[in-house]
Every structure is written in C-alpha cells, then in structure tokens.
C-alpha cells in the first residue's frame, strides 16, 4: 500500500516539473500557481504516508525538508538559482524527501548512496548540476571543434576586449549561428549586441544573461550591422536552457540510476 503513495508522489512531481520546465523554456517564466498546487498535494501525500506507514520517519522528514529549504534559499539569494528553481526544490523536498528505492531500484547498486536515504532532494540537486555541467562541456567541445575545423578565432573585433569571464560563459553556453537561423528559432537567444559609442559606430558586446525582453531589438541591431558589413553573418547565440529542465532530468536520473555522483566516486575508488 505504501508503494501507491510513493508512486503518486513521483507521478505528481513529474507532471508538475515537466509542465514547469516546458513553461520556463517557452515563456521564460513559471506561474506561481504551479507551486501553489504542487506543494500542498506533495505535503498531504507525504504526511499521510508517514502517519499511516512509517511514523518514525516524520522527524527525518522535517530534517530533509528543512535542510532543502535552507539550501534553496541560500542558492536563490546568492543568485545561483532563480525563483522557480528554488520553489521546485522546496516542492520536491515535500514530495520526495527520501529515496524511492521501494518503487524504483537504481539500475546499478552503486546508485544507492547514504545521502539518498536521508536527503533525496540533494541527490536530485547534484544530478542536476552534473548534467548541466556535462551539457556545458559538450558545448565547449563543440566550439573548440569548430574553431579547429574552420580556423577562425572565437571572438572577433571588439569582442576580443571582453573579459575572460564573459568569454568563458559564452563558450560553455552558446555557439555561433547565422543571423537568419537565429531569427527563425524563437527559443534561441543572441549572446551579443551592438552598442553605439562616440569612437565607433558599431561596437559588439557580449550578453551573458539573455532575456526575452528586447530580443527583437537586439536582432534588428545585429541585422543592420551585418547588412552594413560591420560584422559577419554568424553571431553568438544560446538556447538558454532553464535550470528547471536539468532539475527534471536530474529527478528522472535519480529514479533510474540513483546518485550519479556517488556512482562516479565508487567507480573511481574501485
């Protein structure tokens, strides 16, 4: 019977997180109503489950939820998380504070970690960060490969004077595509803009936090600069995948594989 509660909490979490990820990807925002519905449903299911089947877990439930809330708040106020990301982890803590091993056994035994038994949301968090890092590694490798194949510098003109930090962010989150393709793909955002200065008519600058607001204006400025042959046809762009997508993938990975970081540690330490 307890397995029905766990299955319900997993299903509810996946439904809300998949919707939130889709909404964040398409509109760059998630309605608060998602969390307003998700949180109480998750809390009620968890409380009822532990009251009926495992009363001794209630104090540890409070510990898991409290610790996850603290981490989510710290990440939000330090700028590491957006509001939706923090709320997602809080809701996950209410729904899935402990390992779902009773319902989903990880594919390999190494996926079962001590952390998952007490702080399952932190396993989802570490999986999410690892998957996001792997995505950044792939994009960086792609850019290096393009640099070698085409014998072109990463940054040209005034972009050369941008800081190393900005260049690194662009290299691990974006790639160069033709302006026409950028116009056609609504979900891809420009990572550079044109700035009018006294000394130069068209100075290129990197945009490391692309936003939906002003996207069309940036594209117009870039198009005019390309038409005047001030810059070439390829501009730095990013799909700007929201962290919520990685959180959702991290949850699915935790259900199927368990704690990926623990698996890697176990593998390298033998």
Tell me what each language-model feature is.
Residues 1-270:
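A membrane-topology feature that recognizes alpha-helical transmembrane segments
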């Amino acid at each position: 019977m307890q397995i029905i509660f766990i299955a319900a909490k997993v299903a509810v979490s996946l439904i809300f997180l998949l919707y939130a990820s889709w909404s964040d990807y398409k509109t760059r925002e998630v309605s608060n109503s998602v969390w307003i519905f998700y949180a109480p449903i998750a809390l009620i299911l968890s409380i009822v489950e532990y009251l009926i089947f495992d009363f001794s877990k209630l104090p540890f439930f409070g510990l898991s939820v409290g610790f996850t809330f603290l981490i989510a708040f710290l990440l939000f106020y330090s700028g590491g998380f957006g509001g939706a990301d923090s709320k997602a982890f809080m809701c996950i803590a209410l729904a899935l504070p402990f390992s779902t091993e009773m319902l989903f056994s990880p594919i390999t035994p190494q996926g079962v970690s001590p952390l998952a038994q007490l702080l399952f949301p932190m396993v989802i968090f570490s999986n999410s960060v690892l998957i996001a890092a792997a995505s950044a590694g792939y994009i960086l490798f792609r850019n290096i490969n393009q640099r070698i194949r085409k014998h072109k510098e990463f940054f040209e003109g005034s972009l050369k004077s941008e800081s190393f930090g900005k260049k690194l962010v662009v290299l691990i989150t974006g790639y160069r595509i033709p302006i026409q393709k950028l116009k056609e793909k609504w979900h891809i955002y420009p990572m550079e803009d044109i700035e009018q200065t006294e000394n130069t008519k068209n100075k290129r600058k990197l945009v490391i936090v692309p936003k939906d607001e002003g996207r069309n204006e940036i594209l117009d400025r870039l198009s005019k600069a390309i038409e005047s042959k001030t810059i070439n046809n390829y501009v730095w762009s990013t799909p700007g995948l929201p962290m919520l997508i990685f959180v959702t993938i991290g949850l699915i990975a935790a259900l199927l594989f368990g704690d990926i970081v623990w698996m890697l540690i176990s593998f390298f330490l033998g």
